[in-house]
Amino acid sequence: MMNRIHAVILDWAGTTVDFGSFAPTQIFVEAFRQAFDVEITLAEARVPMGLGKWQHIEALGKLPAVDARWQAKFSRSMSAADIDAIYAAFMPLQIAKVVDFSSPIAGVIDTIAALRAEGIKIGSCSGYPRAVMERLVPAAAGHGYCPDHWVATDDLAAGGRPGPWMALQNVIALGIDAVAHCVKVDDAAPGISEGLNAGMWTVGLAVSGNEFGATWDAYQTMSKEDVAVRREHAASKLYAAGAHYVVDSLADLPEVIAHINARLAQGERP
């Protein structure tokens, strides 16, 4: 069957590993503190999630509340040199900590096996730079998650998200003949934009990732009402970014792919 999904391109933190996407958020808070003794909140740290990490720090500096704190302390806005300094603090912290957040999210291993049984290739890309991915990839493999290909945010001269380049590099590496036969899966808006810009179907994850922003343990004990409110908040952001589908976690992906395959068979395209 030619007219079906041939590849999925998966994000990492909050999508396949690190439920709630905590590895990067906590490190941003620590890097701001370490480099300039400026406090940011976890909620603020989550706002630009999905961008490359230098661009993420730049976006944090432009948040009105963070800019106000910066102005109060330094009588100016954040500069490129400031971003470099925070990034320099961020990198060793992230490299050291990322292995602690490398366990696959519940359902990921079984889902990957089911997709591979259907002949679907598993691509991946991340807002993490290569130095971090070189630690994360083998750690995740040790836990049983090993995609067919991965691309880091600083691998390509053209750049990272929300541009299409990391997703398209997966298409090239995996030998996929049509972007309409690919699905980009992500828990943050820039990754949905990436998939759309690459001409792919896009699936947002509303519970496992950054926008929901809870640990697995917290999620397990959360009231149904709280889950519903958080899910709606996350889903609305992902749909606003243009996601074709939004589900809770990667475990829900096979059902979505069956739906997309039916649409492809009828001649639909993303």
From Swiss-Prot:
Its cofactor is Mg(2+). GO terms for biological process: DNA repair; organic phosphonate catabolic process. GO terms for molecular function: magnesium ion binding; phosphoglycolate phosphatase activity; phosphonoacetaldehyde hydrolase activity. The active site is at D11 (nucleophile), K53 (schiff-base intermediate with substrate). Binds 1 Mg(2+) ion per subunit. Keywords: Hydrolase, Magnesium, Metal-binding, Schiff base. Mg(2+) binds at D11, A13, D187. It comes from the Bacteria. Homodimer. Belongs to the HAD-like hydrolase superfamily. PhnX family. Involved in phosphonate degradation. This is Phosphonoacetaldehyde hydrolase.
